[in-house]
Amino acid sequence: MAAPTSKLTPDEDSIRMMLTAKVHIGTKNVENKMRKYVYSRTQEGVHLINLAHTLEKLKVAARAIVTVSNPEEVVVVSARPYGSRAVLKFSHYVGSHPIAGRWIPGTLTNQITQKFIEPRLLVATDPRTDAQSLRESSYVSLPVIALCDTDSPLNYVDIAIPCNNKGKESIALMYWLLAREVLYLRDQLKRWMPWDVLVDTFFWRDPEQFEQKPEETVNTHDDDLLTSRPTVPLHPLPDWSTVDPAHANSSDWKVMAAGHEEWGSFVDTRAQWQ
């Protein structure tokens, strides 16, 4: 009798995508609790993550997200800029509550603030950059799922997904895989059906690149106008040192007067007041 296959068997296609996005590339430092997820170490001292554990923990995290009946009670945070777009896209397809950017202190503990929320699950991109949200979650006994690198502290983290949480490609792929697995478990997407959403839509994009493109087009247009401007033919300037023969013998300037022979011929027509 053949042994039953485990549901947490790593998918070869997902593993191949992780290798392409460099999800397995860790750091030179390693936390003691993260050593069990390290596969090996390179000659440069960089620790490599075992992607089998990564995919296994990712499926466990997806099951924890599905257990929350109201998707809006799942908060996904990312203080790291590379994870802001991935968090927004993940929340768009899953229905969670995204917080991209700076975490406002007191979001989970201060009921007076307008941003106060009471979620049931927290998903963090980096335990170091999202330390404030993890600390507040410990005050309210909120379970936490986090993308953890080899040097990430596991304080206040309940489910750690070992991966590279510093590269924009790695962060985007991890949120894409997590969103797809959540849709699988919710039966909104069949496992034999490919997801029509590309991983590229989760990538972080620099807004300065979009601001430079219009300027470049305007400059090229101005250059075309300058190069295509018609040239005006240059006529030779007249030589003022030469004398017109028609006026060569006209020494009397009285001829230049407007129909008058002498300047004294003008009659003063003003009234005599005396």
From Swiss-Prot:
Query: For this protein, what is any one GO molecular function term?
Result: structural constituent of ribosome
Q: Name one Pfam family in it.
A: Ribosomal_S2
Q: Can you cite a GO biological process for this protein? A: ribosomal small subunit assembly
What keywords sit in the KW lines? Answer: Cytoplasm, Ribonucleoprotein, Ribosomal protein
Give a short account of what the protein does. Answer: Required for the assembly and/or stability of the 40S ribosomal subunit. Required for the processing of the 20S rRNA-precursor to mature 18S rRNA in a late step of the maturation of 40S ribosomal subunits.
**UniProt KW Acetylation keyword:** no
List where in the cell it is found.
Answer: Cytoplasm
Q: Which family does it belong to?
A: Belongs to the universal ribosomal protein uS2 family.
Q: Which organism is it from?
A: Theileria parva (East coast fever infection agent)
Q: What is the organism lineage in this UniProt record?
A: Eukaryota, Sar, Alveolata, Apicomplexa, Aconoidasida
Q: What protein does this entry describe? A: Small ribosomal subunit protein uS2
Q: Name one GO cellular component term.
A: cytosolic small ribosomal subunit
